[in-house]
């Protein structure tokens, strides 16, 4: 039996939800027993473990509030990779953005048989701009040692109610317990997508939330998930996307690929860029139109390749727009590609943009339409 099959059959066999009779962890409640623990109960070679995590996503009438709490045990501070953490935040081209609030984080250690905690300071917070639409707030926890416990909580406020971040129940370290709740008005419709090799079990309920809204009766739907001991996820060589096998769930506002296409076509940062006149290239286009189609296309491609510089930023939407790009000569991947398509069409070479996912994000799921999939 090959390594791939052995790894995942093994994960399937031990992915039994072992129910805990103890109380759920609460922020600030760290015990000497937890700090003195030197090895994980089920995975003795684990470098760290998630003692508990909880996520609550609440759609508050078109805006999303997400509460996150995690408690992490560090067994090997040099190899765990869990002595810091990051939060991904999305920003639309219109300037709407997700924001993080009320972050509190501590590292706990034992000194003279007493619990001592170190608070995360502002100078230990960093921002990494991944693309025009995505940034990551990174937090480097202080005073992390073998045996430490890291604990943090924060809130995300998002104007994108249709875009609920994926919730992972499985990581590269064991997760002892995980709770996840999603609450939304009944008139909101979401697609649900589950990942992993073991089906998730959820509980659903509804309750009245006071006066009726303009969309009808004000009923809130709640979906609840709970897992106990999910084993660490082991990567396998040559696997295209390990996240397809990570136990997780994702909710996204219902739409269709046709609606996604219409949204892109009408966007001032995408489709409308293809209609820009590009006056500085008028003479160039008139000249290349005299060439055969193949030479015409090669000439335009070479012109764009020589004239413009990629700023190393990804994104399906333009950053500068093709007009500004033609003046400043630098832009993101959408700026340059949409200008190329615009020029090809002006030269009577019918060209259409194609939008997909990056290879690292795995294959595009056609059954789960949405802008966040692209």
PLM regions: where:
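Bacterial Sec-dependent N-terminal signal peptides
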Residues: 1-26
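Alpha-helical structural motif
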Residues: 8, 66, 99-101, 176, ...
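Residues at structural and domain junctions
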Residues: 8, 56, 136, 166, ...
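Beta-strand-rich, non-transmembrane domain signature
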Residues: 22-268, 272, 338, 345, ...
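Acidic low-complexity segments
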Residues: 235-319
């Amino acid at each position: 039996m090959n390594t791939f099959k052995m790894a995942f059959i093994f994960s399937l066999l031990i992915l039994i939800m072992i129910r805990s009779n103890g109380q759920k962890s609460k922020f600030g409640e760290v015990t000497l027993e937890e700090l003195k623990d030197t090895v994980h109960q089920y995975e003795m070679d684990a470098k760290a473990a998630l003692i508990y995590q909880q996520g609550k996503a609440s759609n508050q009438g078109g805006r999303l509030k997400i509460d996150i709490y995690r408690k992490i045990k560090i067994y090997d501070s040099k190899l765990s990779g869990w002595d810091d953490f990051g939060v991904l935040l999305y920003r639309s081209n219109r300037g709407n953005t997700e924001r993080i609030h009320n972050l509190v984080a501590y590292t706990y250690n034992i000194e003279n048989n007493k619990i001592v905690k170190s608070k995360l300071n502002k100078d230990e917070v960093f921002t990494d701009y991944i693309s025009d639409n995505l940034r990551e707030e990174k937090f480097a926890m202080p005073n992390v040692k073998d045996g430490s416990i890291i604990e943090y909580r924060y809130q995300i406020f998002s104007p994108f109610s249709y875009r609920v971040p994926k919730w992972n129940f499985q990581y590269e370290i064991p997760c002892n317990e995980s709770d996840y709740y999603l609450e939304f008005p009944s008139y909101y419709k979401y697609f649900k997508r589950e990942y992993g090799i073991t089906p998730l079990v959820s509980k659903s309920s509804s309750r009245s939330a006071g006066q009726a809204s303009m969309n009808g009766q004000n009923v809130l739907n709640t979906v609840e998930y709970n897992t106990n001991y999910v084993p660490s996820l082991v990567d396998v060589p040559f696997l295209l996307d390990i996240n397809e096998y990570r136990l997780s769930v994702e909710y996204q506002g219902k739409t269709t690929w046709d609606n996604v296409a219409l949204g892109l076509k009408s966007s001032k940062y995408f489709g409308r860029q293809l209609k820009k006149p590009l006056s500085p290239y008028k003479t160039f286009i008139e000249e290349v139109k005299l060439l055969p189609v193949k030479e015409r296309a090669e000439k335009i491609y070479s012109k764009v390749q020589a004239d413009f510089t990629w700023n190393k930023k990804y994104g399906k939407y333009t950053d500068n727009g093709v007009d500004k790009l033609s003046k400043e000569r630098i832009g993101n991947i959408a700026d340059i590609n949409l200008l190329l398509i615009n020029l090809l069409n002006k030269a009577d070479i019918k060209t259409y943009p194609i939008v997909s996912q990056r290879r690292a994000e795995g294959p595009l799921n056609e059954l789960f339409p949405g802008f966040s999939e692209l």
